[in-house]
Amino acid sequence: MTQTDPAFQNLLAEFQALHAREPALAGFVALPDSLTPQPVTPVRIPPAALMESDPDLTTTAYAAIRDAFIAAGAVAQWRLTYQGSRLGADFMDRFACYCLIGEGGPFASDSLAAYVVYMPAGLYYPFHQHPAEEIYFILAGEAEFLMEGHPPRRLGPGDHVFHPSGHPHATRTYDRPFMALVLWRGDLETAPVLTYPEGEI
């Protein structure tokens, strides 16, 4: 039987409570009656420390889940999605993401995946896409979200943005960092790819 780290158990409880009280999350995907625990091999990356020590991840309503994501980061399998792509060391050393539900996370589900994404101030996450439908729910800080065919949107805590399947989107921070809960539904297996692998015009 898989023993789940208490930090992950606390994070799951905070996630379930947030999902129950936020219509945008509950309307995007239902939570299954039970989640399957699975073992996690911790992987540490440089931006994990940035997230843990960032003094500007300000939030009021979402401080509990923000702190739970930070605490569980110590035992998480941080992701290296864009390793080997055109995104260089500066991006890889500052963009942070790990999974709560899904591949590499402490819990498995066939119906959804759940991640935390962190970007410090002054970082651009280029246009990318994936078959999964996605919602970003901002927990702390602020970021600008771009989606092809739509005007940019600057979002803060409690705001959300939906990304349709296969639709290119990007994220930029300016003078503040941000942290978001990210949920996927649909194709949970196919990783994101850069829309313009050779570089944006």
From Swiss-Prot:
Cofactor binding, per record: Zn(2+) probably constitutes the cofactor in vivo.
Pfam families listed in its UniProt record: DMSP_lyase
Description of the deletion phenotype: Decreased dimethylsulfoniopropionate (DMSP) catabolism.
Reaction equation(s) it catalyzes: S,S-dimethyl-beta-propiothetin = acrylate + dimethyl sulfide + H(+)
Enzyme class per UniProt: lyase
Residues annotated for a divalent metal cation binding in this entry: 130, 134, 136, 169
Superkingdom, natural source: Bacteria
Keyword Membrane on entry: no
EC numbers for this chain: 4.4.1.3
InterPro entries reported for this sequence: DMSP_lyase (IPR031723), RmlC-like_jellyroll (IPR014710), RmlC_Cupin_sf (IPR011051)
Keywords of the record: Lyase, Metal-binding
Keyword check for Lyase: yes
Cofactor(s) this protein cannot do without: a divalent metal cation
Gene Ontology MF: a single term: metal ion binding
Subunit structure: Homodimer.
Function: May act as a dimethylsulfoniopropionate (DMSP) in vitro, releasing dimethyl sulfide (DMS). DMS is the principal form by which sulfur is transported from oceans to the atmosphere. The real activity of the protein is however subject to debate and it is unclear whether it constitutes a real dimethylsulfoniopropionate lyase in vivo.
Family: Belongs to the non-heme iron-dependent dioxygenase family.
Protein name: Dimethylsulfoniopropionate lyase DddQ
Species: Ruegeria pomeroyi (strain ATCC 700808 / DSM 15171 / DSS-3) (Silicibacter pomeroyi)
Gene encoding the protein: dddQ
